[in-house]
Structure formats: structure tokens, C-alpha cells
């Protein structure tokens, strides 16, 4: 069964590009344009990995909020921030919230796909060894 990747990105063109590129790598992709839309989708099923933008529409810290909410549900869920907010304080905040990676935009789709693959392998190894 294909691993499930969720992308939360308010820019429709970027969201479509990421979803297309990731699905071509064999993943099942759910794409959301807002925090509220994503939470509704996550109520139905949590993905295996989440990619979050921080600014979603008018909500300047929506990605941070969403990360908190997701990790409260599933503490071992791999979360990647993919954002234009690249100040060190934002990176520190994202990592302290529990994100596994913090990537700046723009990013090549190949590199993003490799980060996803790498983090899923790490998570799978953690699951097999029982490491929390």
C-alpha cells in the first residue's frame, strides 16, 4: 500500500505542483489549502507524513498551530515545514514544535521527494525497533 502524504499549502499552483510530483513517486497524496480543510481531512485519516506551509491565507502561524494539533494526536508523525519563512527564529520554533525538517522555498521537487523518502525510512526503522 502506498504511503500517504498530506500537503497543506494555500497557493493552489504550488499545492498542485507538489501533489503531482509526489504522487509520481508512488505516494498517495492529499492536498489541502487551509488549516481548517486539513483538520477536516485529518479527522478522517492521518497521513504517514505531513508537509506544512506556515502561512495559510490570513493565518500567519497556521502551520505552527496545525503541527501542534497533529503531534498531539500522533507524536511520531513526521512533519516537514516547507515555507518562505526562513528566519532562524521560525526554524527554531518549527523544530521545537516537533517538526522533523524545516525546508525553505523554493525547493526542487526532486530534493523534496528525497527528503520525504528519507524521513519515511527513518520512521519505519523507528517503528521496527520500538524507538520513540
Q: Positions of the model-derived regions?
A:
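Acidic, metal-coordinating helix/loop segments flanking the phosphotransfer/catalytic sites
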Residues: 31-49, 57
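Short amphipathic alpha-helix used as the core "switch/output" element in two-component signaling
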Residues: 40, 61-75
